[in-house]
Amino acid sequence: MTQQEIKLIAFDLDGTLLDSVPDLAVAADQATRAVGFPGVTELQVRDYVGNGADILIGRALSQSLTINPELSDELRAQARELFDDFYQQTGHKLSHLYPTVKETLKELHQAGFTLALVTNKPSKFVPDVLQQHGIADYFVDVLGGDSFPEKKPNPIALNWLMEKHQIQPTEMLMVGDSKNDILAAKNAGCASFGLTYGYNHGEPIAASEPDFVADSLAQLLDVVLVSA
């Protein structure tokens, strides 16, 4: 990959563009308590997110990153349904964009890059969140965690984007905050841009060996915008 080649930039959402944990934590706490289990704190949920809502709820019920195998499918399904309801009720009022996100997306959009969103978040929640924070119009494609049979780190969503837009792996960049984002990029054969903030279970993003590591999304501009 060279900077001149990049045509499409795929972004993760939670932990990359949006700090959504405050709302997720409220919903997870309410859901676990509703089924008779101990509640969870925001600090716990920061560790549990990143692999989709089913995994988040399994971890919350287990009070651990490792899901208790004795939890029944019925219980997990009930808690997940409650979680979805409670999360919808939060109105996403506690979530907020990270610094420089809106400005960076605007500049990339104006520069002519194709921008896509590839998140493990359930699809039904994504449009409202993007609209609420004023960034929906920047994305040509919005792919949720249930858009395909597999979630990141499976590359199926990234492969779909490359096929749709008729581009090569060298022409796409994946931007994210977790090893699932970096592994998805590696599995798709494209470069990755890893952010040091966000949700990565306490593991430095550099450990996943992304092609670029940054503390701010604004640093992405230095990677993809090449002066004439």
Curated annotation (Swiss-Prot):
Protein's pathway: Organic acid metabolism; glycolate biosynthesis; glycolate from 2-phosphoglycolate: step 1/1
Keyword line: Carbohydrate metabolism, Hydrolase, Magnesium, Metal-binding
Enzyme Commission number, as recorded: 3.1.3.18
Enzyme class: hydrolase
SUPFAM superfamilies listed in its UniProt record: HAD-like
Reported cofactor(s): Mg(2+)
Family statement: Belongs to the HAD-like hydrolase superfamily. CbbY/CbbZ/Gph/YieH family.
Function: Specifically catalyzes the dephosphorylation of 2-phosphoglycolate. Is involved in the dissimilation of the intracellular 2-phosphoglycolate formed during the DNA repair of 3'-phosphoglycolate ends, a major class of DNA lesions induced by oxidative stress.
HAMAP family xrefs: GPH_hydrolase_bact
Protein name (Swiss-Prot/TrEMBL): Phosphoglycolate phosphatase
Taxonomic lineage of the native organism: Bacteria, Pseudomonadati, Pseudomonadota, Gammaproteobacteria, Vibrionales
Gene: gph
